[in-house]
Design a protein with these regions (language model features):
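NAD(P)H-binding glycine-rich loop region in Rossmannoid oxidoreductase-like domains
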Residues: 12, 18-53
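Flexible, glycine-rich beta-alpha linker
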Residues: 80, 102, 120-146
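Conserved C-terminal active-site "lid" loop/helix of NAD(P)H-dependent oxidoreductases
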Residues: 173-199
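SDR active-site strand-loop-helix element
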Residues: 4, 39-40, 72-78, 128-130
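Alpha-helical substrate-binding/gating segment
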Residues: 130-137, 150-173, 181
């Protein structure tokens, strides 16, 4: 396992310093690599966010194609957050509706780039869609609601293992809703359950229940 970033690891673990905006850095970091998991994201600056989210996705997939790597896990926010806000059980394959939000548009473009490379070069690629990461809860929150598209770190780690173990990705690219909360039933996990065997590792939503 090789970690790559532009910043030092918060716990002092060894990493490769790689700027995803620089193709040569990305390409040289992939020597001897069997699979790539892309968790890059930047939101706060419009110029840099385009370079990281869009150009970065291009550089990664081009480097993957150039080196012959055949497995990629790409990540990003769902493209159904605005238009489908009043629906329930929203499937991952609902038509994308990224709205006019600049960040969502950059991630929409990155997904299309990844999909195009995956199908042209026959790279088995999974796109994991979620809206926020969270540590495992340690106490009852007493909240009246929960964020319905957040995934717990533990669950994402399991989903990544399941994705790496999936030998064949239909049509070389498939997107998956991923979250840790069955309770709200807003975003469907059916596809992830069926193709990956994904289920939340614990009943995380129980931590949201109010005492009566």
């Amino acid at each position: 396992l090789i970690l790559a970033d532009v910043k030092a690891h918060p716990n002092g673990l060894p990493i490769q310093n790689v700027d995803v905006r620089d193709y040569e850095q990305v390409r040289s970091s992939l020597d001897g690599v069997d699979a790539v998991l892309n968790f890059t994201v930047l939101r706060h600056d419009k110029t840099s966010s385009f370079q990281v989210n869009v150009l970065g996705a291009w550089n990664i997939m081009k480097a993957v194609a150039d080196t012959g790597i055949k497995k990629v896990i790409h990540t990003g926010p769902a493209q159904t957050l605005e238009w489908y806000s009043h629906d329930t059980n929203i499937p991952v394959d609902a038509p994308d509706a990224p709205s006019t939000d600049y960040y969502l548009l950059t991630k929409h473009l990155s997904n299309e780039i990844v999909k195009s490379f995956a199908r042209k070069y026959e790279i088995h690629t999974l796109c994991y869609l979620f809206q926020g990461l969270s540590a495992r809860p340690m106490k009852l929150s007493q909240k009246t609601s929960t964020r319905d598209f957040v995934i717990i770190y533990d669950d994402l780690a399991v989903a990544c293992r399941q994705g790496l173990e999936l030998d064949l990705v239909p049509d070389f690219y498939q997107a998956f809703n991923l979250h840790s909360h069955y309770g709200p039933e807003k975003y469907s996990l059916e596809k992830a359950e069926r193709l990956l065997g994904y289920v939340p590792q614990e009943k995380w939503w129980d931590w949201q229940r109010r005492s009566v």
